[in-house]
Structure formats: C-alpha cells, structure tokens
UniProtKB/Swiss-Prot annotation:
Domain of life: Eukaryota
Source organism (scientific name): Fasciola gigantica
Alphabetical keyword list: Acetylation, Lipid-binding, Transport
Lineage: Eukaryota, Metazoa, Spiralia, Lophotrochozoa, Platyhelminthes
Residues bearing PTM N-acetylalanine: 2
Gene that this sequence comes from: FABP-1
Transport recorded as keyword: yes
Gene Ontology terms for molecular function: lipid binding
One Pfam family here: Lipocalin
Protein name in UniProt: Fatty acid-binding protein 1
Coiled coil stretches, renumbered: none
Length: 132
C-alpha cells in the first residue's frame, strides 16, 4: 500500500456527472463537486490508512482499517457503511452501502497516476489523480 502514500492532485474525470446524478445529488451540488478539484493526502500506519481530501467545498479526513466496516458521511450528507479492502500493494476496493444504493470504488496506482473507477448500478465514472 506504500504506492498510495503521499500527496495527489486532481487530474481529470470521465462520466462523473452521470455518476453523481445516479446517486441523486442535486444538479447545483453536482456542479460544485465537479468544479472543486480536490487534492488528497494518503498516509499509512500499519493496517490503518488515512485519506485527507481538501477542496474548495470542504476538507474531509477519513481513517479506516483495511477489511473493517466503518460509518461515514457521503457527499450528499447521508450516513453509509464502508469497507475498504487491499487487492494488492497498488490496488484497493471500497464498497459503500447507503440507504438507497451501494457504490464500488476501485483505486489503483499506475506509475505516477492513481486511477479510480467509481460504479453505482449501471453507471461508471473514472477519475485520475496525479502524484504531487
């Protein structure tokens, strides 16, 4: 998981608007999210990872232990249960179950890029972060 550790800046995204709308997020909030251009810092201590996301909308810090379910707040302010598992040293899968949906996010580090594939129902989006 050391490949994830460090700072990452927003690169680009594909189909994120459709993904956010599928989650039921309002058009106004979708526009704000798409223009936020977040930066991330990943830290790792043993089997526990912390992801700090800083954007023009807010700062969010999420700490979790791989393989253990935890409660978190979604982008639209709802409570959801999430589990993150290690697939390899450079790949992790996040499954989040909220009141109306289940999402999957697969993050993989390839060179100096982190590719995240977001899925809800039949809608997929991809975001790319660049090593800062």
């Amino acid at each position: 998981m050391a490949d994830f550790v460090g700072s990452w800046k927003y690169g680009d995204s594909e189909n994120m608007e459709a993904y956010l709308k599928k989650l039921g997020i309002s058009s106004d909030m979708v526009d704000k999210i798409l223009n936020a251009k977040p930066e991330f810092t990943f830290t790792l201590e043993g089997n526990q990872m912390t992801i700090k996301m800083v954007s023009s909308l807010k700062t969010k810090i999420t700490t979790f232990t791989f393989g253990e379910e935890f409660k978190e707040e979604t982008a639209d302010g709802k409570t959801a249960m999430t589990t993150v598992t290690k697939d390899s040293e450079s790949k992790m899968t996040q499954v989040t179950t909220g009141p109306e949906y289940t999402t999957h996010v697969v993050r993989e580090v390839v060179g100096d890029k982190m590719i995240a594939t977001w899925t809800v129902g039949d809608v997929k989006a991809v975001t790319t972060l660049l090593k800062a």
